[in-house]
């Protein structure tokens, strides 16, 4: 192989290798069961993707700043459990707080999003002003949030929280039927989140600031960017996205436990990297995040659909994450 051809091959591998791997996996899934591409399955994939897109948008903003968030999944779980206890139907015999009226959905959204924002602010404060790395900071908060959620879950009975008010069930499980295809309400919420983040990243000073911080924090500081304040804001905003995603996930599934959200952060990180959000910082697009989430959800759903052992699924997903990050590192090293 000539030096030129070898260089072209390596360039192609770095730029598109992960997509080749994912396409091969998809081809295997379809070969095993062609019914995988039914309209019902595609509807389910889109609905599952929608919640993950909201969560991944929160993670993506942090990766853009050279950060990450290992506590995302546990924040999703906390929001799900809190929302579930506040949105049970009054005629539910197992209602956690039987004397308390079912709260309005809008109020519960504000409550869980406020909780998410506070956790995000704590992460941001530790990272921006105590100079603790995002990995260690969010690893610690991941454990703390899970402990808080487990204590609350134990306090309210330590059993799956279900029996939601009909209004919330419609809010989270409703859909528009287009023949055999069902476009869920959750997908509309995800589209709103996508539009919001696209405008935030591309049309606001804040968006320019976070990309500047990710590209070169010192240069951003010299140019007048308040790095600490912007990190506080992006971590708080991420917490809001996790919380809203957790509330929707509880409604979509129809119940919540303290283990809901387990490993969601890894799926979100993997989807972001597959979608072109670089751990080197300062690189990423909203469309890339959406694409990465949909691709990863198709693989997850497909492996389950054809009956692949869940333990093998963990191995496959872990390998995809390592491969995607390795390719991202190679691309960054080449640019350096």
Curated annotation (Swiss-Prot):
It is found in: Cell inner membrane. One of its GO terms (cellular component) is ATP-binding cassette (ABC) transporter complex, substrate-binding subunit-containing. Residues 38-52, 202-226, 278, 327-336 are cytoplasmic. InterPro entries: ABC_transp_permease. One of its GO terms (biological process) is galactose transmembrane transport. Keywords: Cell inner membrane, Cell membrane, Membrane, Sugar transport, Transmembrane, Transmembrane helix, Transport. Its main location: membrane. The keyword rRNA-binding does not apply. Residues 1-16, 74-106, 149-180, 248-256, 300-305 are periplasmic. One of its GO terms (molecular function) is galactose transmembrane transporter activity. It is a multi-pass membrane protein. The complex is composed of one ATP-binding protein (MglA), two transmembrane proteins (MglC) and a solute-binding protein (MglB). Part of the ABC transporter complex MglABC involved in galactose/methyl galactoside import. Probably responsible for the translocation of the substrate across the membrane. Belongs to the binding-protein-dependent transport system permease family. AraH/RbsC subfamily. PANTHER family: ABC TRANSPORTER PERMEASE PROTEIN YPHD-RELATED-RELATED, GALACTOSE_METHYL GALACTOSIDE IMPORT PERMEASE PROTEIN MGLC. This is Galactose/methyl galactoside import permease protein MglC. The gene is mglC.
């Amino acid at each position: 192989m000539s030096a030129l051809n070898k260089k072209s091959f390596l360039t192609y591998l770095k730029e598109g290798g992960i997509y080749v791997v994912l396409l091969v996996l998809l081809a295997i899934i379809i070969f095993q069961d062609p019914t995988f591409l039914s309209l019902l399955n595609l509807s389910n994939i889109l609905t599952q993707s929608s919640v993950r897109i909201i969560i991944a948008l929160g993670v993506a903003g942090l990766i853009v700043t050279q950060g990450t968030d290992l506590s995302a999944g546990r924040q999703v779980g906390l929001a799900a459990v809190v929302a579930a206890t506040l949105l049970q139907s009054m005629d539910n015999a197992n209602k956690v707080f039987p004397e308390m009226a079912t709260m309005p959905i809008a109020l519960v959204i504000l409550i869980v999003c406020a909780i998410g924002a506070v956790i995000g602010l704590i992460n941001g404060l530790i990272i921006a002003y105590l100079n603790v790395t995002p990995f260690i900071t969010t690893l610690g908060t991941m454990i703390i949030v899970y402990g808080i959620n487990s204590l609350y879950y134990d306090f309210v009975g330590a059993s799956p929280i279900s029996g939601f008010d009909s209004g919330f069930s419609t809010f989270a499980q409703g859909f528009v039927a287009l023949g055999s295809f069902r476009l869920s309400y959750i997908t509309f919420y995800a589209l709103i989140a996508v539009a919001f983040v696209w405008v935030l990243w591309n049309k606001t000073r804040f968006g320019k600031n976070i990309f500047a911080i990710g590209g070169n924090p010192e240069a951003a500081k010299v140019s007048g960017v308040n790095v600490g304040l912007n990190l506080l804001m992006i971590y708080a905003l991420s917490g809001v996205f996790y919380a809203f995603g957790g509330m929707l996930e509880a409604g979509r599934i129809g119940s919540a436990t303290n283990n809901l959200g387990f490993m969601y952060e890894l799926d979100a990180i993997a989807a972001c990297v597959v979608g072109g959000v670089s751990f080197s910082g300062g690189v990423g697009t909203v469309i890339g995040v959406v694409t990465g989430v949909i691709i990863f959800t198709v693989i997850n759903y497909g492996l389950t659909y054809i009956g692949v052992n869940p333990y093998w699924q963990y191995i496959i997903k872990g390998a995809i994450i390592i491969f995607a990050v390795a390719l991202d590192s190679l691309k960054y090293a080449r640019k350096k």
